[in-house]
């Protein structure tokens, strides 16, 4: 039991640390962003160890893990939110004054197979008929070639922003806000590809709509294959791969935190009603 006791201590300590992830600047403690990714697995491990010690009647270890597990109960919904009694047979009825908002990273209108998905996505928007739309990685060139987009433009006012000039931007994507309400003005918070806003008139109110696309984790297809399939690599190659992934997670978490600070200042200083949308590229525990 000594080995499992040590494992329990390690898992319990790690679980406690995950509770502090949202409150610690990624730039000050480098491993906290990685803990955020591991939080669901650590929580499951904590539950398993708690049950093990209960079965063994080791109440000190069981009690310690029970405290850790109970402390995390309210965070479980961040990862898993079962809707056992929800029915999809009927649509939810909304108040007539409700505003329907859609936020969608359209990935430059390219699907997983590399083919254009612009018409499919625009048809989905047409079917859902949202009042406000925030699109990330919007490819203006492909959109403007689509007849569906022309039809969409007849129903929505569109706030266009400049194209991304980043060297890794293959398709020149940017952020776009579409509104069935009149757009008064629009501007950028950081860059046209990371954070923008538009003021729209909803009834008698001015509402500022923020559209954000924060720094990604930079985890690519090769990294996903390595993580999910336990791809066989030599010890040296495995160490290099893990070091590369962790380094990118850390560096991009720091950059993302700086973006959040800048955006939060602008959102906080906004005197009108606000709607904040976007692809935030982070874990629920962040």
Segments from the language model and where they lie:
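Membrane-anchoring hydrophobic segments
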Residues: 1-3
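Membrane-embedded alpha-helical segments of integral membrane proteins
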Residues: 6-57
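Active-site surface patch of divalent metal-dependent phosphodiester/phosphate bond hydrolases
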Residues: 26, 32-44, 67-72, 88-100, ...
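Acidic/histidine-rich helix-loop elements
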Residues: 33, 98, 103-118, 140-142, ...
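Transmembrane alpha-helices and immediately adjacent membrane-cytoplasm interface residues
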Residues: 43-88
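The feature marks either
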Residues: 88-93, 126, 181-183, 203-205, ...
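Active-site beta-strand/loop signature of hydrolases that rely on acidic residues for catalysis
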Residues: 98-106, 121-146, 162, 198, ...
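Active-site catalytic loop in hydrolytic enzyme cores
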Residues: 191-237
